[in-house]
Curated annotation (Swiss-Prot):
Coiled coil: none annotated. Residues 104-149, 562-621 are annotated as: Disordered. Residues 1-21 form the signal peptide. GO terms for biological process: cellular response to amino acid starvation; meiotic cell cycle; negative regulation of TORC1 signaling; positive regulation of autophagy. GO terms for cellular component: GATOR1 complex. Mediates inactivation of the TORC1 complex in response to amino acid starvation. Required for meiotic nuclear division. The gene is NPR3. This is Nitrogen permease regulator 3. Belongs to the NPR3 family. InterPro entries: HTH_NPRL3 (IPR056603), Npr3 (IPR005365). Residues 569-582 have a biased composition (Polar residues).
Length: 715
């Protein structure tokens, strides 16, 4: 298992209330929670040695008679790599799968070809795995009829309700309890002493809510999520569920209860329906709004999809974001979902809640990006483009928005070759703030992906995370149907990352200008499915030993010049004093003071020499204390943050610009625009858009300062 794979571990949802009569279980989904899934797994705990011997014996007998793929039930149709259960098998899943293989091999060797075909259609690997999913997908199938008041994992429902209805002091905060390896998680909402469900600042609303609460006796409601996460992932999965789903859904229900008495009315409706329908829970769910909310929430969250809930006539959506965005390559032992996107630009947007950055190490910590105010996601996203993950009309239909709404028009106008800033300029009716809101909305709800605008002048490579071993077989035929006039998928990927030469601009792959749009569409398809990522350029400013020596010599010469100037000024002062003494009338004075002053004047040059030594020593200390990276024995130095360069570092930079490279005023202006980005963290491809610099100007600058930069190209 890995934190990159979705695993909500949700096995049920309970609705518990507390009235003057005590706690009561109102509704639960699935209806039958009496069985313990861990007990069902025990029957598959066979002896490993016996199973291996049987497996090897039967395989040696049948391998020459029957096709191996058919014997194992593995082919391109039933090996559904797109299904989430494909990546979440457990030991019990594997044992069950091996049992299915045994029975399949026996039937293949004993049945006729017609019966064999029927057997293969009946037993599919996808069905086998999906029925034993760790995400409790068995619970999402049509459950048997059962009483809501029945046992919950072998424990009396009334006993569990007593524990799930905490006293008022423990309500309105996170609630977590473990019973028989099952974790009960929720946010119990209790009515305050003044009859309010939440603090209200206006007296009118206060009086209105008092009339609501006077009509019912509901004191507390608690929506409890029952989970069985893996032990090693327990804390992470529980926090994830509470943050994204439980806390938000409970607060929405509290709001509706405060404003419209929603929960109280639904509880009365459910109790009345339970009496009239005589245990027909499926019909109860269809007639109760809150029951449908609980059912839809379970079916959406347990399958790692988006739960679209209609709460009191308002559409609310909840999800646990999946991790398909990576800023660096994960370890080989860390699994991830196919079609994941690998790009350093994810790091710039990782400080928002809209992108859930993937883990690069097993059971590591979530990536936390620290960005300054200038590079915040709110400001920098306007320079990015959106890549829709589905057809525009399908997205509009799935989001249940009107076809002529502003959001629908925005979705239709999205082009992966245009940044959001250009979209705003192209449509005067949409301001940039509204476009950013729409963009974040599409990103969060898995309808679009943030990328740098596609360009034929950019360089693209095959992603190290490309799903070549998982989806390539199916995607080859799909790519050929989608782009019949283009090279095949393997050949297309070979053109992007050839073995004989370095990757070049995408324009070298396009045969002519007439093919440009079609090739860019194919490029967008490859990025969407995780096959391709953009190769970006990052640079550091390098200070050679030669530059440092010259700057140090300049500093020493300046100090010597200052010393000579002081000596000259001192001699002039002494001469002036002597002339004034000869012209002055002779007065009876004490010669002691004169001797002291003469001795001070004679000793002043020596004092200047001693004074210059601490300054030179301080210079060396400043050089040693500069935040730099030494490459080879202190010869060359990389400035880590040229945007906040020290005084000495600025002198190094000026020496490069004006004396070593002798840049023109135009290139000097471009250099200072890019100086703060020469830290190896910002790609030049993004800066071209951000600073409005042409590629020709950038190319001239890089050629001029080529000896003084270190360039690295990666995703």
């Amino acid at each position: 298992m890995s934190l990159n794979l979705p695993n909500p571990s949700l096995i049920g949802i309970l609705l518990v209330i507390s009235t003057h009569s005590g706690p009561q279980l109102i509704y639960k989904y699935p209806f039958d929670l009496s069985n313990d899934p861990s007990r069902d797994e025990s029957k598959y705990a066979l002896d490993d040695n016996e199973d291996d011997e049987l497996y090897d014996h039967e395989e040696s007998e049948d391998e020459n008679e029957v096709n191996e793929n058919e014997m194992y039930g593995v082919n391109s149709r039933n090996w559904d790599s797109k299904h989430i259960d494909y990546y979440m098998g457990t030991k019990s899943d594997l044992l069950k799968f091996l049992d299915e293989q045994d029975s399949r091999r026996r039937k293949i060797t004993t049945t006729s070809p017609s019966e064999e075909k029927h057997t293969k259609e009946k037993h599919g690997l996808t069905k086998t795995i999906s029925k034993s999913s760790t995400m409790a997908s068995s619970s999402t199938t049509s459950p048997p009829e059962s009483s809501i008041q029945g046992e919950i994992f072998g424990t009396d429902a009334a006993y569990i309700c007593e524990m799930l209805a905490p006293p008022k002091q423990m309500c309105n905060t996170r609630f977590e309890m473990t019973i028989q390896d099952k974790l009960f998680l929720g946010l119990p909402v209790h009515r305050s002493d003044n009859g309010q469900w939440r603090s209200i600042g206006h007296n009118n609303e206060h009086d209105e809510e008092e009339t609501h609460t006077a009509k019912n006796s509901l004191n507390m409601f608690h929506l409890v999520f029952v989970m069985n996460p893996p032990v090693i992932e327990s804390n992470y999965r529980v926090d994830e569920m509470f943050h994204y789903v439980i806390s938000r859904l409970s607060l929405v229900l509290r709001y509706e209860q405060q404003k419209h008495d929603y929960v109280s009315q639904q509880v009365k409706n459910i109790l009345a329906l339970r009496e009239s329908l005589e245990g027909n829970e499926s019909l109860l769910t269809e007639k109760s709004s809150l029951s449908r909310v609980i059912r839809d929430c379970f079916e959406g969250i347990s399958t790692s999809t988006i739960a679209n809930l209609s709460i009191n006539g308002k559409l609310r959506s909840f999800q646990i974001p999946i991790k398909t965005e990576f800023h660096s390559l994960p370890d080989p032992s860390v699994p991830f979902l196919p079609a994941s996107y690998l790009s350093s630009t994810v790091e710039l947007l990782g400080d928002t809640s809209f992108i859930n950055v993937g883990e690069t190490s097993r059971y590591g910590h979530a990536f936390n990006s620290v960005q300054d105010e200038e590079n915040s996601a709110e400001k920098i996203i306007v320079y990015f483009a959106l890549l829709l993950l589905d057809d525009p009309e399908s997205i509009i239909k799935d989001m249940k928005t009107e076809t002529d709404s502003t959001l629908a028009k925005f979705i239709r106008m999205i082009e992966p070759t245009e940044s959001l800033l250009k979209l705003s300029a192209r449509n005067s009716k949409l301001d940039i703030s509204q476009i950013k809101d729409f963009a974040f909305h599409l990103i969060y709800w898995r309808r679009a992906r943030v990328i740098l605008p596609l360009s034929s002048r950019s360089v693209y490579i095959v992603s190290p995370m490309a799903p070549i071993t998982i989806k390539l077989y199916d995607d080859i035929s799909f790519f050929n149907r989608r782009f019949p006039t283009l090279p095949s998928l393997p050949h297309f990927l070979k053109l992007l990352s050839p073995q004989s030469r370095k990757p070049q601009q995408f324009a070298t792959v396009i045969p002519s200008k007439d093919h440009r749009d079609r090739y860019l569409q194919a490029l967008g398809w490859l990025i969407k499915h995780g096959y391709v990522t953009q190769l970006q350029t990052f640079i550091w400013l390098k200070i050679s030993r030669k530059i440092k020596i010259k700057v140090e010599e300049d500093i020493e010469n300046e100090n010597l010049a200052k010393k000579k100037k002081k000596q000259k000024n001192g001699s002039v002062t002494v001469a002036t004093a002597n002339s004034s003494k000869t012209e002055a009338p002779i007065m009876p004075t004490d010669n002691t003071s004169k001797q002291v002053s003469d001795s001070k004047d004679s000793d002043k040059p020596e004092d200047d020499e001693y004074a210059s030594k601490p300054r030179l020593d301080g210079l060396h200390e400043h050089i040693d204390g500069t935040p730099i990276v030494t490459l080879v024995q202190g010869d060359d130095t990389i400035i880590l943050d040229p945007g906040r360069a020290t005084t000495l570092e600025r002198r190094w930079i000026n020496k490069i610009i004006y004396e070593e490279c002798k840049l023109s005023p135009e290139l000097t202006a471009v250099f200072y625009k890019l100086l703060k980005y020469m830290n190896g963290k910002n790609s030049l491809e993004l800066l071209l858009l951000k600073e409005n610099i042409s590629r020709s100007e950038l190319r001239k600058l890089l050629l001029s300062i080529e000896e003084h930069i270190i360039s690295v190209r990666h995703w």
